Amino acid sequence: MRYHKIYPAAVCFCAYLIAIGVILGDPAEILPGLLKIIMTEDALITDYVKIAGIGAAFVNAALVTLISLGILRLSEDPLNGFTLVEIGLMAGFALFGKNIANIWPIILGTFLYAKLRREPFGKYASVSLLSTSLAPVVSYVALDNGWGNIWWAIFIGAVIGFVLPPLSAYTYKIQNGMNLYNMGFACGLLATILVPVMTSLGAKPNVAHHWATGYNTELGICLGGLCLVLILTGLLFSGRPVWAAWAGYRRLLLTTGRAPSDYLRMFGVAPTLINMGVNGLIGMAFILLSGGDLNGPTLGGIFTIMGFSAFGKHARNLTPIMLGVVLGSFCMHWNINDSAVQLALLFGTTLAPISGYFGWPFGILAGFLHSSVVLRAGTPVEGFNLYNNGFSGGLLAIVLYPIITEAIRHRRPELQEADYLEDVFEQDSPTIPPPIFKKR
């Protein structure tokens, strides 16, 4: 089995998360904190560090990641770059929205979908994990806030998990590989229908805002250490000469990042690890330099960036997006250090392929537009879609791709309207990278 070291490395990552929780938090408060996480509504923005303490938040992240690894291993999901995406997403969002209880009904629904189609669950295991973007719906219904109960929560969660595989397969194609958080777009569409129906039946969901502050030094040291370990491992301990690892990373920077771009299969372990570490440092630098906070949500955003560093993101295509969000802070009626904008700064890098494919000026434009669109995209779904930036990114990708393509076609005749992928579900076969276009 290729990339067999992913599982041991991921377990070490989980152990690191637990160590952070135990060292920075009070061990005696971890179990009560985990119970509080389970018994709390998880709509955006619910920072587990704020409501349950840093110890419980990081232990929850480790447990959710271990559960995800177990599902991937038992289902024999093929190991590739997208496996690292799943690890980053599940660990990151387990700091603000996903917990060891609310993810199960959705996973069950996808499992039933695979059984109905008489296909191996391994084909849909990654979809089942990503579908937990709507885990806050399960928590809301299960906690019986005058509407619903645990059985309705299991049923609704299973329905969500059941319908998202075909829906996400369709939405993947219409975005032309320009939105990396495809599941966020699919979940946003589903939530746009689901939440109004729930409201019509008597539900009264409320958008939350729990945001921890004061952890920049501690979490900055922990995150910076993790990123440096990844970079040094890629350079020195990956079985390749340092010059070869660095040369591979430089070639990686020339790609567009258009989905699907599996960097692990395209360039190998060393350049991918370097890319993950560098991008993590970039994300942390933007947050700290803009006066933001390192906490559950922002650390979740950085973990997501690091995960997608194995599947489309690199320094050259994500930096213009982030600069576009910063530019928006000088023009719009909001501040760059507002909590929602800090998340847009990190998660807006879902549009990194636009920057890589069309050029950095269009990346800045996409980031600029995203910084405003995302602030309103979550309103119809009451914060129930954790991947709200993916929903906003999908809307912008669908609008911007044909407009930009048509606008610059006379200078870039090689641009094509047709998508080049047919199968959204990851398989363990070689990936052909998208063409790299250079200015003539």
Please give the residue ranges for each predicted region.
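Membrane-interface helix-loop-helix junctions at boundaries between adjacent transmembrane segments
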Residues: 119, 131-160, 164-221, 377-382, ...
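Short, structured motif recognition centered on aromatic/hydrophobic residues
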Residues: 64-67, 82-93, 104-114, 127-133, ...
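Short, highly charged, low-complexity non-transmembrane loops/tails of multi-pass membrane proteins
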Residues: 213-214, 248-255, 410-431
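N-terminal signal-anchor module of multipass membrane proteins
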Residues: 1-98, 231-243, 264-273, 281-288, ...
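C-terminal transmembrane helix pair
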Residues: 157-171, 182, 339-411
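Structural signature of hydrophobic alpha-helical transmembrane segments
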Residues: 50-62, 93-104, 147-160, 290-299, ...
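Transmembrane helical segments that form the transport core of multi-pass membrane transport proteins
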Residues: 79-82, 242-330
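Hydrophobic alpha-helical bundle architecture
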Residues: 73-77, 91-98, 111-124, 135-145, ...
